[in-house]
């Protein structure tokens, strides 16, 4: 893959994560700005000359973006099937930009802000599925993991930069306080939109619709290799085989992901992604400014900025933690660590923060901030990135898109519930809220220990066999997973009706001459997909009589 294209993917596609992070990191500070409160808050205290929100209005302004994200995540799958990932990313970027414009131009009506948040969420939710998926399909295997993780890195970077912008604008005059913080988000959407416009469609999508020649051209361009390269041919054959397997047995339906074979992993993915929110991370990211204001800090914006900086910096550590420590151990240890941090945070806030005379104990407030940072230190390296990695690795090809969509929507659902109900809960029980998150973190560790297998270093086929085996997650995994996966594939091939082999390209000799491949990609007669069948019985029979060095030809529409 050329350096230019690699940098382009990192900068432009990952910027979709920046858009998500920027919205998350900015809303807490914006709702605390005086001009924003004077226009959209529903309570005013003339004695103290301060504005405040009812719990319902605070929760709706903050949380409605997650409602939009929930539905955006669901509609991303059928949209991608129709127009491809690249075009879908472009379309949802436009939706996101429209939502931001509506927010910036809001009149003194909090309903407009709420509706704009829903519209913005449609784009953010869809892009949270599409961007990592596009990267994983276009990037070559040896850098695929690094490129995909940059999405999460950009999420944390967006949160941090949004906190910096809030820090710089909260003292500005009138509407500039919050319009600048919201309006700057247009930049991230425009960067993503322009960058993706110059990228190619995913080779996997092109093969799935029969445009094999175009897919090969994209792979050659990305890898800077000729069509006869072993790398190109191997990748093409794998994609072709995957696409065949994906449609084997017909399109996957929603009820099927809760069938006997896959429901264990479906519910596990939903649990892992739910606990990703129930760790309490967005308690800080959404309401950090208000939380630290309640601890007596003179500059709650600064405290929130410090927390977001820790989150951004520690995400780099997550790249190495998941690579060398696997998935299970970081999630288990991270959950226990985070539980301890929240327990201490809640205990100090509940028992030591407020003195008997009603003043704040600044030392207690400092302790709370320290343990908040320690929580983020762990989350950014464990539950932040690892939850998405587990969901991306756990499902067979045929079920992957729908299972991942269900898991991700559970994440957005809990995201909304926490963002909406947090004002109600904190107004009722204050810092005791931390005990709830401490319990959830402990439960997350237990669920991971009991149900999540270690998938580090395994192929997707081996991971599938691991979950189908009788091995317990806390026991040593079977050493013959590769043989089990191969045996299952052979069994599947033997039971396939004659003439429907999906492994013709996969088992054919990979050391092929480039002439046939190139000429086929450029000179084949293009026929509608429905009328062509390069894997029919005659073709397979012909392939057995060809010299071993003959190249593989491709058909396209």
Curated annotation (Swiss-Prot):
Residues 482-557 are annotated as: Disordered. Residues 485-510 have a biased composition (Basic and acidic residues). Residues 31-58, 109-112, 166-179, 286-301, 350-363, 426-432 are extracellular. Keywords: Glycoprotein, Membrane, Sugar transport, Transmembrane, Transmembrane helix, Transport. One of its GO terms (molecular function) is carbohydrate:proton symporter activity. It is a multi-pass membrane protein. Residues 546-557 have a biased composition (Polar residues). Pfam families: Sugar_tr. GO terms for biological process: carbohydrate transport; D-glucose import across plasma membrane. High-affinity glucose transporter. This is High-affinity glucose transporter ght1. It comes from Schizosaccharomyces pombe (strain 972 / ATCC 24843).
